[in-house]
Amino acid sequence: MLTDMPNILVTGGCGFIGSHLVEKLLDQGFFVTVVDDNRSGSHYIEHEMVEYHKCDVMHFNPHHASIEPPSAIFHLANSPRIRRALEFPTETITNNIATTCAVADWARIFNCKLFFATSSSTQYV
């Protein structure tokens, strides 16, 4: 880690909301670790205090990743596409639940006490 400031982990940090969150965390001086497959987001923030892991949340292994344990986790990685959710509602809901459970497990692995989970409009399909 490049700073003495706490590390904040953000899933979906390349999406619209996630990238704005990353910018705000950087403005406050935090080091930010982003896990995002970058399929639906294109808001990649080039900054010396951001470390990117380009992968699906379900394929990220916190045991093998060389990241500083985060002091907080913001989980924003969910299926954002309404059209796809309407076509494949079970797959969408299953994916959103599975990714949230996986990231909650990261909080346990990292002994992280602050875990914030959000969702997308696809939860209402």
Give the positions of each predicted feature.
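N-terminal Rossmann/SDR dinucleotide-binding element
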Residues: L2-A72
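Catalytic nucleophile serine of serine hydrolases
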Residues: G12, A85, S119-S121
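Alpha-helical elements of the RecA-like P-loop NTPase motor core of helicases
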Residues: S19, H43, R83-R84, C101
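Surface-exposed alpha-helical interface segments used for non-catalytic interactions
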Residues: E23, A98-C101
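Short beta->alpha connector loops of Rossmann-like oxidoreductase domains
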Residues: G41-S42, P80-R81, Y124-V125
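Acidic, glycine-centered active-site loop in nucleotide-sugar glycosyltransferases
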Residues: E48-M49, F88-P89, S119
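NAD(P)H-binding glycine-rich loop region in Rossmannoid oxidoreductase-like domains
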Residues: V57-N95
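Conserved Rossmann-fold NAD(P)-dependent oxidoreductase catalytic core, especially the SDR/UDP-sugar
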Residues: H75, C101-V125
